[in-house]
Amino acid sequence: MHFLTIYPNCSSGVVRAQSRTEQKNPLGLDDLGIQNLGQTVSLAPAVEAASMLKMEPLNSTHPGTAASSSPLESRAAGGGSGNGNEYFYILVVMSFYGIFLIGIMLGYMKSKRREKKSSLLLLYKDEERLWGEAMKPLPVVSGLRSVQVPLMLNMLQESVAPALSCTLCSMEGDSVSSESSSPDVHLTIQEEGADDELEETSETPLNESSEGSSENIHQNS
């Protein structure tokens, strides 16, 4: 049964396999010429790796805590930057969405204005066309009107003449009645005047006769 002894401080990195006899004779019996008891094995890479593994835990006490704390810090920093990026992304998306909506509204308003302008132009053209159609038969209409005007005047004269005659008749009747009433008044006035004169004339003879009779009476007495 062989045992391996590792010498980490050995520069050559030689590992020596010892037997039980060598373990019992630690004084170095190999100096006596006994070479079959031990075999030299070159395990330099394995020894270096083992020595590094043994040295790293000794030297990495503080860096271990630093390494354990650094992922937390990196995660916290990554979380903060991630939140900032998310907010920025949301703002960018909302701004693009708002710009898109504003563009849609502006396009809709422009289309409505164009439709209104086109409708106004169509109405204007229709009115011009109707006005032109109405203005074309004006000479014929003027001729017809020139023919119809005398007829209308005749009709008006025929319709107005009876009314005028009726009004004239009524006015004449009023004047005749007024004239007939005025001679009656004059006659009554004249009759009253004649009656007064007759009374005066009748009174004067009576007075004279009474005076004469009174004188005769005085004379007879």
UniProtKB/Swiss-Prot annotation:
Residues 58-72, 203-221 have a biased composition (Polar residues). InterPro entries: K_chnl_KCNE. Keywords: Glycoprotein, Ion channel, Ion transport, Membrane, Potassium, Potassium channel, Potassium transport, Transmembrane, Transmembrane helix, Transport, Voltage-gated channel. It is a single-pass membrane protein. Coiled coil: none annotated. GO terms for biological process: membrane repolarization during action potential; membrane repolarization during ventricular cardiac muscle cell action potential; potassium ion export across plasma membrane; regulation of heart rate by cardiac conduction; regulation of ventricular cardiac muscle cell membrane repolarization; ventricular cardiac muscle cell action potential. Residues 1-86 are extracellular. The keyword 4Fe-4S does not apply. Residues 192-202 have a biased composition (Acidic residues). It comes from the Eukaryota. One of its GO terms (cellular component) is apical plasma membrane. The chain crosses the membrane at residues 87-107. Glycans are attached at residue 9. Residues 58-77, 175-221 are annotated as: Disordered. Predominantly expressed in embryo and adult uterus. Low expression found in kidney, small intestine, lung and heart. GO terms for molecular function: potassium channel inhibitor activity; potassium channel regulator activity; transmembrane transporter binding; voltage-gated potassium channel activity. Ancillary protein that functions as a regulatory subunit of the voltage-gated potassium (Kv) channel complex composed of pore-forming and potassium-conducting alpha subunits and of regulatory beta subunits. KCNE4 beta subunit modulates the gating kinetics and enhances stability of the channel complex. Associates with KCNQ1/KVLTQ1 alpha subunit to inhibit potassium currents. Forms heterooligomers with KCNA3, inhibiting its activity by impairing localization to the cell membrane. The stoichiometry of KCNA3 and KCNE4 in the heterooligomers are 4:1, 4:2, 4:3 or 4:4 respectively. Increasing the number of KCNE4 subunits steadily slows the activation KCNA3 and decreases its abundance at the cell membrane. However, a single subunit of KCNE4 is sufficient for the cooperative enhancement of the inactivating function of the channel. However, a single subunit of KCNE4 is sufficient for the cooperative enhancement of the inactivating function of the channel. Belongs to the potassium channel KCNE family. PANTHER family: POTASSIUM VOLTAGE-GATED CHANNEL SUBFAMILY E MEMBER 1, 3, POTASSIUM VOLTAGE-GATED CHANNEL SUBFAMILY E MEMBER 4. This is Potassium voltage-gated channel subfamily E member 4. It comes from Homo sapiens. The gene is KCNE4.
